[in-house]
Regions:
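N-terminal basic/disordered segments at the start of proteins
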Residues: 1-26
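Helical "lid/coupling" subdomains associated with nucleotide-phosphate turnover
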Residues: 3, 17-20, 40-64, 68, ...
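Ser/Thr-glycine-rich phosphate-binding loops at phosphate-binding pockets of nucleotides
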Residues: 10-12, 79, 124, 141-147, ...
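N-terminal glycine-rich anion-binding loops that anchor highly charged ligand groups
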Residues: 24-39, 66-69
Length: 312
């Protein structure tokens, strides 16, 4: 069966088309576009017309790929930004029009933070060594961060309403961020993590797995890549000291300096400092609570979990 997943988050819209056989996936096409659907949502509570238009353009291109590859089933999920807005009906109507032209009846669905966490976990653990379990899987998005503990199943999860876009819009207004802005952002992250780690007992974890664009970009920079190489990133490992060094470097840079880095995806340079601050705080907590001082980065994530869910 050829199945597809579309994940529309606060910062990016992503597509996976895969062949599914006996519960295993073979990638046919995987793509990410930065559309910033959630731009300004934290302040206004509404999707901006320009953000809807950018998302429509990307989704139209994705629909063409679904048709070209003969996709039989597709599931599109919308996450943090869509949970928070009052005009989501405009978004739903757009997705129904674009996707429905290829797969009749297809439309985006808003999933809860709990389901987002479970799908991310399911997608991430497929190729991990079970001897390294339990895993704490962290999906750091634009508007929310999912923290999940488990081995062959989810033991505990929490969706925190903080991510690289939301943190940047709330706290990091200067270029580069001032020390005062950085400290304010750290306080916000610590407040959210205090709650999350009261629910998810990360001290039981043996391995930390990071998902999504902030994590993958940090790994690329830690490994001194001049261009982004997804095959090399998948299941790459970053020692804690290297991770913190890259985070500090990014936080101190201007947006233009970050944008000039070879592995930096277009549209991520203005928000990755917020993601780096969150990763630093996570790294410190996991080292203190669980003795974990290494990050494993996976390219397989919620998209893989969504495809598995739609393929049955």
């Amino acid at each position: 069966m050829t199945a597809a997943a579309v994940d529309c988050g606060t910062n990016s819209i992503r597509l996976l088309i895969a062949e599914v056989s006996d519960g295993r996936l073979r990638d046919v096409h995987r793509e990410t576009r930065i559309v910033r659907l959630g731009q300004g949502v934290d302040a206004t509570g509404r999707f901006a017309p320009d953000a809807i238009a950018r998302t429509r353009t990307a989704l139209t291109d994705y629909a063409s790929l679904l048709r070209a590859h003969g996709v039989e089933r597709v599931r599109m999920v919308a996450t943090s930004a869509a949970r928070d807005v009052t005009n989501r009906d405009v978004f739903f109507a757009m997705t129904a029009e674009v996707l429905g032209a290829v797969v009749p009846g297809a439309v985006a669905e808003v999933i809860t933070g709990t389901e987002e966490a479970e799908l991310s976990f399911r997608g991430a653990i497929g190729e991990l060594d079970s001897a390294a379990a339990p895993f704490v899987v962290v999906d750091l998005g634009g508007g929310s961060t999912e923290i999940v503990l488990g081995g062959d199943r989810v033991v505990a999860s929490y969706s925190a309403d903080i991510g690289c876009v939301r943190l940047t819009e709330r706290c990091l207004h200067s270029d580069p961020p001032t020390p005062e802005e950085v400290e304010t952002a750290r306080r916000v992250v610590r407040e959210r993590l205090d709650v999350a780690l009261g629910v998810v007992p990360v001290e039981e974890a043996r391995s930390w797995v990071g998902l999504a664009g902030t994590m993958t970009t940090l790994s690329a920079l830690a490994h001194n890549m001049t261009t982004y190489d997804s095959a090399a990133i998948h299941l790459s490992r970053v020692p804690g000291s290297d991770l913190l060094a890259v985070c500090e470097r990014l936080i101190g840079m201007t947006r233009s300096q970050r944008a000039a880095l070879g592995p930096m995806h277009e549209g991520r340079a203005d928000v990755i400092a917020g993601g780096a601050i969150e990763v630093e705080e996570l790294a410190c907590e996991l080292r203190t609570r669980a003795g974990i001082d290494e990050l494993i980065v996976s390219e397989h994530d919620i998209l893989d979990g969504i495809v598995l869910s739609v393929a049955g």
